């Protein structure tokens, strides 16, 4: 069974590309465009990780990261501006560093989380 990744983004161009990269890397992608939809998925389904685009406003990002933290689901924020603002995410990755850096960071985060479970 492929690990499921919740991908949250309101971006119309970048989100499908990012989701295709995740799927090509072997992840089952659950794409959503709103925080409310993301929170609903987190309450109803098993998710291995959360990927949050920079397009999600910081207060909304904080809500999702907090819910993920409570459920012990690691989260990665794709953030070229490094706006951490105490959002409880596990990791911030600059998407301009390329898909390999993003995928490596996600894989190492999920492996670390799996070892601590």
Kindly give the residue locations of the regions a language model identified.
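Conserved dinucleotide-binding and phosphotransfer motif residues
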Residues: 24-25, 71
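Conserved phosphotransfer microenvironments
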Residues: 52-70
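His-Asp phosphorelay/catalytic-motif detector in bacterial-type signaling
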Residues: 46, 69-78
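Conserved acidic segment of CheY-like receiver
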Residues: 2-12, 18-22, 50
């Amino acid at each position: 069974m492929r690990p499921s990744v919740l991908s949250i983004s309101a971006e119309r161009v970048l989100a499908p590309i990012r989701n295709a990269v995740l799927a090509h890397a072997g992840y089952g992608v659950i794409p959503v465009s709103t925080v409310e939809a993301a929170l609903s998925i987190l309450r109803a389904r098993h998710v291995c990780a959360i990927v949050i685009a920079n397009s999600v406003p910081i207060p909304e990002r904080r809500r999702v990261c907090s819910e993920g933290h409570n459920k012990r689901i690691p989260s990665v924020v794709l953030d070229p501006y490094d706006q951490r603002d105490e959002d409880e995410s596990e990791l911030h990755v600059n998407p301009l560093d390329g898909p390999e850096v993003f995928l490596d960071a996600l894989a190492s985060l999920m492996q670390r989380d799996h070892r601590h479970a």
